[in-house]
Amino acid sequence: MATRLKEKYTSEIVPSLMSKFNYTSIMQVPKVEKIIINMGVGEAVANAKSLDTAIEDLQIIAGQKPVVTKAKKSIAGFKLREGMPIGAKVTLRGERMYHFLDKLMNVSLPRVRDFRGISSKAFDGRGNYTLGLKEQLIFPEIEYDKIDKVRGMDIVVVTSAKTDEEARELLTQMGMPFRK
Protein backbone atom coordinates (compact mmCIF):
# COMPACT_ATOMS: atom_id res chain seq x y z
CA MET A 1 0.00 0.00 0.00
CA ALA A 2 1.59 3.25 -1.13
CA THR A 3 1.48 6.16 1.27
CA ARG A 4 -0.61 9.26 0.62
CA LEU A 5 2.48 11.38 -0.06
CA LYS A 6 3.95 8.86 -2.54
CA GLU A 7 0.68 8.77 -4.48
CA LYS A 8 0.51 12.57 -4.53
CA TYR A 9 4.12 12.64 -5.78
CA THR A 10 3.51 10.28 -8.72
CA SER A 11 0.10 11.64 -9.74
CA GLU A 12 0.44 15.42 -9.21
CA ILE A 13 3.99 16.54 -8.39
CA VAL A 14 5.88 14.70 -11.17
CA PRO A 15 3.75 16.15 -14.04
CA SER A 16 3.84 19.61 -12.43
CA LEU A 17 7.66 19.61 -12.06
CA MET A 18 8.12 18.22 -15.59
CA SER A 19 6.24 21.17 -17.09
CA LYS A 20 7.83 23.76 -14.78
CA PHE A 21 11.48 22.74 -15.36
CA ASN A 22 11.02 21.36 -18.92
CA TYR A 23 12.36 17.87 -18.21
CA THR A 24 12.47 15.51 -21.18
CA SER A 25 12.33 12.29 -19.16
CA ILE A 26 10.36 11.32 -16.08
CA MET A 27 13.64 10.12 -14.53
CA GLN A 28 14.99 13.70 -14.42
CA VAL A 29 12.30 14.77 -11.96
CA PRO A 30 13.83 15.21 -8.50
CA LYS A 31 12.64 12.89 -5.74
CA VAL A 32 13.26 12.48 -2.04
CA GLU A 33 15.96 9.82 -1.71
CA LYS A 34 16.36 9.48 2.05
CA ILE A 35 15.80 11.23 5.35
CA ILE A 36 18.47 11.15 8.05
CA ILE A 37 17.51 11.91 11.64
CA ASN A 38 20.49 12.60 13.89
CA MET A 39 20.46 13.14 17.63
CA GLY A 40 23.68 14.25 19.29
CA VAL A 41 23.71 13.33 22.97
CA GLY A 42 26.58 15.27 24.55
CA GLU A 43 25.83 14.14 28.09
CA ALA A 44 26.34 10.50 27.03
CA VAL A 45 30.05 11.06 27.85
CA ALA A 46 29.27 11.27 31.57
CA ASN A 47 25.98 9.37 31.69
CA ALA A 48 25.59 6.35 29.41
CA LYS A 49 21.92 5.91 30.36
CA SER A 50 20.96 9.18 28.65
CA LEU A 51 22.03 7.67 25.31
CA ASP A 52 19.68 4.71 25.84
CA THR A 53 16.67 6.98 26.37
CA ALA A 54 17.66 9.05 23.32
CA ILE A 55 17.88 5.86 21.24
CA GLU A 56 14.47 4.78 22.54
CA ASP A 57 12.93 8.16 21.61
CA LEU A 58 14.50 8.04 18.15
CA GLN A 59 13.24 4.49 17.60
CA ILE A 60 9.68 5.51 18.54
CA ILE A 61 9.82 8.57 16.25
CA ALA A 62 11.38 6.86 13.21
CA GLY A 63 9.92 3.38 13.52
CA GLN A 64 13.27 1.67 13.06
CA LYS A 65 16.35 0.99 15.18
CA PRO A 66 18.94 3.80 15.28
CA VAL A 67 22.67 3.36 14.80
CA VAL A 68 24.89 4.58 17.65
CA THR A 69 27.37 7.22 16.45
CA LYS A 70 30.82 7.26 18.02
CA ALA A 71 33.39 10.03 18.48
CA LYS A 72 35.88 10.21 15.60
CA LYS A 73 38.66 11.69 17.70
CA SER A 74 39.44 12.52 21.31
CA ILE A 75 38.81 16.05 22.60
CA ALA A 76 40.23 16.65 26.08
CA GLY A 77 38.15 19.79 26.66
CA PHE A 78 34.95 17.75 26.38
CA LYS A 79 36.43 14.75 28.28
CA LEU A 80 35.87 12.77 25.11
CA ARG A 81 37.81 9.69 23.97
CA GLU A 82 37.88 8.30 20.45
CA GLY A 83 35.22 5.63 19.93
CA MET A 84 32.95 6.78 22.77
CA PRO A 85 29.23 6.66 21.89
CA ILE A 86 27.96 10.26 21.61
CA GLY A 87 24.72 10.08 19.64
CA ALA A 88 22.38 8.14 17.40
CA LYS A 89 21.10 8.40 13.85
CA VAL A 90 18.50 6.77 11.63
CA THR A 91 18.37 6.69 7.83
CA LEU A 92 14.86 6.31 6.44
CA ARG A 93 14.17 5.26 2.86
CA GLY A 94 11.18 4.09 0.85
CA GLU A 95 7.81 3.62 2.54
CA ARG A 96 8.98 4.65 6.02
CA MET A 97 10.59 7.79 4.62
CA TYR A 98 7.36 8.98 2.97
CA HIS A 99 5.38 8.11 6.09
CA PHE A 100 7.78 10.08 8.31
CA LEU A 101 7.86 13.09 5.96
CA ASP A 102 4.05 13.16 5.83
CA LYS A 103 3.85 12.97 9.63
CA LEU A 104 6.55 15.64 10.05
CA MET A 105 4.88 18.15 7.71
CA ASN A 106 1.25 17.64 8.71
CA VAL A 107 1.35 16.71 12.39
CA SER A 108 4.68 17.44 14.10
CA LEU A 109 5.80 20.81 12.68
CA PRO A 110 2.44 22.52 13.36
CA ARG A 111 2.86 21.47 17.02
CA VAL A 112 6.03 23.58 17.39
CA ARG A 113 5.49 26.58 19.65
CA ASP A 114 4.99 29.90 17.75
CA PHE A 115 5.26 28.05 14.43
CA ARG A 116 5.24 30.36 11.41
CA GLY A 117 6.84 28.03 8.90
CA ILE A 118 10.35 26.69 8.43
CA SER A 119 13.23 28.63 6.87
CA SER A 120 13.56 28.31 3.11
CA LYS A 121 17.28 29.19 3.30
CA ALA A 122 18.47 25.91 4.81
CA PHE A 123 19.33 24.25 1.48
CA ASP A 124 22.97 23.22 1.02
CA GLY A 125 23.50 24.16 -2.64
CA ARG A 126 23.07 20.59 -3.88
CA GLY A 127 19.34 20.17 -3.31
CA ASN A 128 19.36 18.83 0.25
CA TYR A 129 17.36 20.40 3.08
CA THR A 130 18.38 20.44 6.74
CA LEU A 131 16.22 21.37 9.66
CA GLY A 132 16.85 21.36 13.40
CA LEU A 133 14.21 20.65 16.00
CA LYS A 134 14.61 21.83 19.59
CA GLU A 135 12.45 19.20 21.26
CA GLN A 136 11.27 15.66 20.62
CA LEU A 137 7.86 16.41 22.18
CA ILE A 138 6.39 17.66 18.90
CA PHE A 139 6.06 14.06 17.72
CA PRO A 140 2.72 12.58 18.79
CA GLU A 141 4.28 9.18 19.67
CA ILE A 142 6.44 10.67 22.44
CA GLU A 143 4.62 10.76 25.78
CA TYR A 144 5.31 13.83 27.91
CA ASP A 145 5.51 11.87 31.19
CA LYS A 146 8.02 9.35 29.85
CA ILE A 147 10.80 11.73 28.77
CA ASP A 148 13.74 12.45 31.07
CA LYS A 149 15.14 15.44 29.20
CA VAL A 150 14.14 17.61 26.25
CA ARG A 151 16.41 16.74 23.32
CA GLY A 152 16.67 18.24 19.87
CA MET A 153 17.56 16.58 16.61
CA ASP A 154 18.70 17.34 13.08
CA ILE A 155 16.65 16.14 10.13
CA VAL A 156 18.24 16.06 6.67
CA VAL A 157 16.03 15.53 3.63
CA VAL A 158 18.24 14.29 0.78
CA THR A 159 16.76 14.81 -2.69
CA SER A 160 18.02 13.93 -6.16
CA ALA A 161 17.56 17.57 -7.24
CA LYS A 162 20.61 19.25 -8.82
CA THR A 163 19.79 22.76 -7.58
CA ASP A 164 18.22 24.29 -4.50
CA GLU A 165 15.45 25.82 -6.60
CA GLU A 166 14.32 22.39 -7.83
CA ALA A 167 14.49 20.92 -4.33
CA ARG A 168 12.54 23.85 -2.86
CA GLU A 169 9.81 23.43 -5.49
CA LEU A 170 9.64 19.66 -4.83
CA LEU A 171 9.29 20.09 -1.06
CA THR A 172 6.83 22.99 -1.41
CA GLN A 173 4.56 20.90 -3.63
CA MET A 174 4.82 18.00 -1.17
CA GLY A 175 3.48 20.37 1.48
CA MET A 176 6.56 21.50 3.43
CA PRO A 177 5.43 24.62 5.36
CA PHE A 178 8.09 27.16 4.30
CA ARG A 179 8.03 30.68 5.72
CA LYS A 180 6.72 33.22 3.23
Swiss-Prot record:
Q: Which GO terms describe its biological process?
A: translation
Q: Which PROSITE patterns match?
A: RIBOSOMAL_L5 (PS00358)
* Keyword Transferase among UniProt keywords: no
> What is one term from the GO cellular component aspect held by the record?
ribosome
The GO molecular function terms of this record are: rRNA binding; structural constituent of ribosome; tRNA binding
Keyword entries, A-Z:
Ribonucleoprotein, Ribosomal protein, RNA-binding, rRNA-binding, tRNA-binding
Task: Extract the InterPro entries matched here.
Answer: Ribosomal_uL5, Ribosomal_uL5_bac-type, Ribosomal_uL5_C, Ribosomal_uL5_CS, Ribosomal_uL5_dom_sf, Ribosomal_uL5_N
Stated role: This is one of the proteins that bind and probably mediate the attachment of the 5S RNA into the large ribosomal subunit, where it forms part of the central protuberance. In the 70S ribosome it contacts protein S13 of the 30S subunit (bridge B1b), connecting the 2 subunits; this bridge is implicated in subunit movement. Contacts the P site tRNA; the 5S rRNA and some of its associated proteins might help stabilize positioning of ribosome-bound tRNAs.
Its family remark reads: Belongs to the universal ribosomal protein uL5 family.
Assembly and interaction partners: Part of the 50S ribosomal subunit; part of the 5S rRNA/L5/L18/L25 subcomplex. Contacts the 5S rRNA and the P site tRNA. Forms a bridge to the 30S subunit in the 70S ribosome.
The UniProt entry, under PANTHER family, shows: 60S RIBOSOMAL PROTEIN L11-RELATED (PTHR11994)
Name used for this protein in its record: Large ribosomal subunit protein uL5
Source organism of the structure: Brevibacillus brevis (strain 47 / JCM 6285 / NBRC 100599)
Task: Give the encoding gene's name.
Answer: rplE
